[in-house]
């Protein structure tokens, strides 16, 4: 650890404590993520180490770069590039108003990062505004990519804060264990709606049951025809047959018609029907968008 000088604690992440630090040789500012390991554990699971070392190969401008992995018997510290703030803090500072072009730019960058990782068979599985980081140039970067695979999908933060269910798709809420890239696309849809509403979450459920009710009240409870595999999921239980909201106009009033169409394609209850990151980037919503 002598290579890095800790400057300040930034916060408690899902997996441990995060510090702002400086590389003593290059003076580069980095984020140190100290991963907490269970006391009764034999140190770092080799599977976790393998996964994490793969993440060093994910090099893309919309992915937070993992510079280094420091590993001692009981400690694992991940050294990431430093970003000024996350999307949640950004929402707090924009006072309920977000320029439609910024919404489009952030979603485009989110999809670019997702498409890159998905093409390499890496899923995020725990996307939310807190792990979308934004730097001073308005560049959005996905953080904590692949950590859910290395350490397991978090059920609660180690700081006892409950991990949010707000961005989890219905198939996962019904106990699906086989994930595909579609898990991240649902989360991207929830984040898109939150961007369009300048930080108001789309489905702020209190627990799994409340979460599913909120989703079905908006999108309609899926029938067996619409989603044949639903009733086979481990935690499936029937819900009232809520009708779908006819239009998303009232849900995301500031989003134009093509934006609403893209949102509907992301928020499909049946994971098979969800649009992919590559398909989403080709959607007409982006036809007039010039990437910086």
Curated annotation (Swiss-Prot):
The keyword Protein biosynthesis does not apply. GO terms for biological process: apoptotic process; associative learning; axonogenesis; behavioral response to cocaine; calcium ion import; cell division; cell migration; cell-matrix adhesion. Pfam families: Pkinase (PF00069). Phosphorylation on Tyr-15 by ABL1 and FYN, and on Ser-159 by casein kinase 1 promotes kinase activity. By contrast, phosphorylation at Thr-14 inhibits activity. Phosphorylation at Ser-159 is essential for maximal catalytic activity. Inhibited by 2-(1-ethyl-2-hydroxyethylamino)-6-benzylamino-9-isopropylpurine (roscovitine), 1-isopropyl-4-aminobenzyl-6-ether-linked benzimidazoles, resveratrol, AT-7519 and olomoucine. Activated by CDK5R1 (p35) and CDK5R2 (p39) during the development of the nervous system; degradation of CDK5R1 (p35) and CDK5R2 (p39) by proteasome result in down regulation of kinase activity, during this process, CDK5 phosphorylates p35 and induces its ubiquitination and subsequent degradation. It comes from Mus musculus (Mouse). One of its GO terms (molecular function) is protein serine kinase activity. Heterodimer composed of a catalytic subunit CDK5 and a regulatory subunit CDK5R1 (p25) and macromolecular complex composed of at least CDK5, CDK5R1 (p35) and CDK5RAP1 or CDK5RAP2 or CDK5RAP3. Only the heterodimer shows kinase activity. Under neurotoxic stress and neuronal injury conditions, p35 is cleaved by calpain to generate p25 that hyperactivates CDK5, that becomes functionally disabled and often toxic. Found in a trimolecular complex with CABLES1 and ABL1. Interacts with CABLES1 and CABLES2. Interacts with AATK and GSTP1. Binds to HDAC1 when in complex with p25. Its EC number is 2.7.11.1. Keywords: Acetylation, Apoptosis, ATP-binding, Biological rhythms, Cell cycle, Cell division, Cell membrane, Cell projection, Cytoplasm, Kinase, Membrane, Neurodegeneration, Neurogenesis, Nucleotide-binding, Nucleus, Phosphoprotein, Serine/threonine-protein kinase, Synapse, Transferase. Disruption phenotype: Perinatal mortality associated with severe disruption of the cytoarchitecture of the brain cortex as a result of defects in neuronal migration and cohesiveness, and degenerative changes in large neurons of the brain stem, such as motor neurons in the lower cranial nerve nuclei and spinal cord. Disruption of lamination in the cerebral cortex, hippocampus, and cerebellum. Hypomyelination caused by impaired differentiation of oligodendrocytes. PROSITE patterns: PROTEIN_KINASE_ATP, PROTEIN_KINASE_DOM, PROTEIN_KINASE_ST. This is Cyclin-dependent kinase 5. Gene3D superfamilies: Phosphorylase Kinase, domain 1 (3.30.200.20), Transferase(Phosphotransferase) domain 1 (1.10.510.10). Residues 4-286 form the Protein kinase domain. Its main location: nucleus. The gene is Cdk5. Specifically expressed in postmitotic neurons and postsynaptic muscle. The modification Phosphothreonine is found at residue 17.
């Amino acid at each position: 650890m002598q290579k890095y000088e800790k400057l300040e604690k930034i916060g408690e992440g899902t997996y441990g404590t995060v510090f702002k630090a400086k590389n003593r040789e290059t003076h580069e500012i980095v984020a140190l993520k100290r991963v907490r390991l269970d006391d009764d554990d034999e140190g770092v699971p080799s599977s976790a180490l393998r996964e994490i070392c793969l993440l060093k190969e994910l090099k893309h401008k919309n992915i937070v770069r993992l510079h280094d992995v420091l590993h001692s018997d009981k400690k694992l510290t991940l050294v990431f590039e430093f970003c000024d703030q996350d999307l949640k803090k950004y929402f707090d500072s924009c006072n309920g108003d977000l320029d439609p072009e910024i919404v489009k730019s952030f979603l485009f960058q989110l999809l670019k990062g997702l498409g890159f990782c998905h093409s390499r068979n890496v899923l995020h599985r725990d996307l939310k505004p807190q792990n979308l980081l934004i730097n001073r140039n308005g560049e959005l970067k996905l953080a904590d990519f692949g950590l859910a695979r290395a350490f397991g999908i978090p059920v609660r933060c180690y700081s006892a804060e409950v991990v949010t269910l707000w961005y989890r798709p219905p198939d996962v809420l019904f106990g699906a264990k086989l994930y595909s890239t579609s898990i991240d696309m649902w989360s991207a849809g929830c984040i898109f709606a939150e961007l369009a509403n300048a930080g108001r979450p789309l489905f702020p459920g209190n627990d799994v049951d409340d979460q599913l009710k909120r989703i079905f009240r908006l999108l309609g409870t899926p029938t067996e025809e619409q989603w044949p595999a639903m009733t086979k999921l481990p935690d499936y239980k029937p819900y009232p047959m809520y009708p779908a909201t006819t239009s998303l106009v009232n849900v995301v009033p500031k989003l134009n018609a093509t934006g609403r169409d893209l949102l509907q394609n992301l928020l499909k209850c049946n994971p098979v029907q969800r649009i992919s990151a590559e398909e989403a980037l080709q959607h007409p919503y982006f036809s007039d968008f010039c990437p910086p």
